Amino acid sequence: MKNYAIILAAGKGTRMNSGLPKVLHKVSGLSMLEHVLKSVSALAPQKQLTVIGHQAEQVRAVLGDQLLTVVQEEQLGTGHAVMMAEEELSGLEGQTLVIAGDTPLIRGESLKALLDYHIREKNVATILTANAKDPFGYGRIIRNAAGEVVNIVEQKDANEAEQEVKEINTGTYIFDNKRLFEALKHLTTDNAQGEYYLTDVISIFKASQEKVGAYLLKDFDESLGVNDRLALAQAEVIMQERINKQHMLNGVTLQNPAATYIESSVEIAPDVLIEANVTLKGQTRIGSRSVITNGSYILDSRLGEGVVVSQSVIEGSVLADGVTVGPYAHIRPDSQLDECVHIGNFVEVKGSHLGANTKAGHLTYLGNAEIGSEVNIGAGSITVNYDGQRKYQTVIGDHAFIGSHSTLIAPVEVGENALTAAGSTIAQSVPADSVAIGRSRQVVKEGYAKRLPHHPDQPQ
């Protein structure tokens, strides 16, 4: 039997008060829609459609060209949204999942369990339900004395007794595909909202004595639908708990999980120590035995084994085994630090390659530089790489020694084993094994200070 899927992503999300479509708001680095698509993939649907409407082009851009979309020009309810898929799916044999694109916490395993239950029970429709402590706002699952599902009643249409029901509709269903589209033809807008409710399909099936079931979620959190920023923050907290728990089970030490932000795309090897207030985002990969200390931020970077990052920012860069960074360093995009490089406090590296065992300990800027192995960069040294229009490269050979407060004006090259004297401005290349001194000769005027206003011998 074939599986199909319809993801509902056409809503405006008015309560988000945002210029961004609701389903594109992110939870742990991925849009809500991407989380849903990832979970839906567990069913391996033969055909999958996403119903888009509000700011359709933005949503389509996230989906890419590989996934089918249909446009709901007017948002006339969930039933109307599913009707938009009729041309693609009507008449096909199989089961169809219908799920909202603003439910980022639903797990693929739960959707698979829902499908298995639907097939096993031979239902024409199966509702994914959950027990809510506070069911306000949700559609209620109404059962008869035998425990069979009779109806789904929306909050605005529920009477007092129905509002006391704790079992709620999560908005996720499995339908017999052919019967779904047959039933949709009988929907009306005779309700408090004046919309086509998808839930009315259940009443249609019950009226024709077809079997409708409900599969109860074990974890209510999975049912969370995000309609405002409060729910978005709630989803973020829950997702972070999941992500951090899995990393800890995999052998990562998080000193304070509640104060550690790790996006879902990040990979961390066992025996890594992550201190509090650390943020790890994007395609970051961290090797075993590395230590990331309090307050560090790492984005789209690959760190080898035994790397230590102390209160620093690393973006779009590659750090080999044994590299140490910080405190208060900034490794900017397109930088590569080879084995055992040391970047100390208040050092900024941008678009540069530093060879093995090279050290830049203090107060340094290295931009657009190709630096060899075992080079020492003295405190306060700067590569001057930008003339206001173009950027130029600085090349420093192996074993070179750059004296403190050297200014290297690119394009310039310092050869292997060469040395620049402290305080030098280097505007011409320095050959290998040479010493370059580029500073004014010191002049001492003995006794002259006594003539200056600051001197204690001067009258005040």
Curated annotation (Swiss-Prot):
User: Among its keywords, does the record have Zinc?
Assistant: no
Reactions listed under catalytic activity: alpha-D-glucosamine 1-phosphate + acetyl-CoA = N-acetyl-alpha-D-glucosamine 1-phosphate + CoA + H(+); N-acetyl-alpha-D-glucosamine 1-phosphate + UTP + H(+) = UDP-N-acetyl-alpha-D-glucosamine + diphosphate
Segments carrying the region annotation (Pyrophosphorylase) are 1-229
UniProt entry tagged with the keyword Acyltransferase: yes
Q: Where is this region: N-acetyltransferase?
A: 251-460
State the coiled-coil residue ranges.
Answer: none
Q: Where does acetyl-CoA bind?
A: A379, N385, Y386, S404, A422, R439
**Where in the cell is the protein located?**
Cytoplasm
Q: Where along the chain is UDP-N-acetyl-alpha-D-glucosamine bound?
A: 8-11, 22, 72, 77-78, 139, 154, 169, 227, 332, 350, 365, 376
| Active site residues per record | H362 (proton acceptor)
Main EC class of this protein? transferase
What is the predominant subcellular site recorded for this chain? cytoplasm
Q: What is the protein's given name?
A: Bifunctional protein GlmU
Please give the InterPro entries that the UniProt record associates with this protein: Bifunctional_GlmU, GlmU-like, GlmU_C_LbH, Hexapep, NTP_transferase_dom, Nucleotide-diphossugar_trans, Trimer_LpxA-like_sf
Cofactor binding, per record: Binds 1 Mg(2+) ion per subunit.
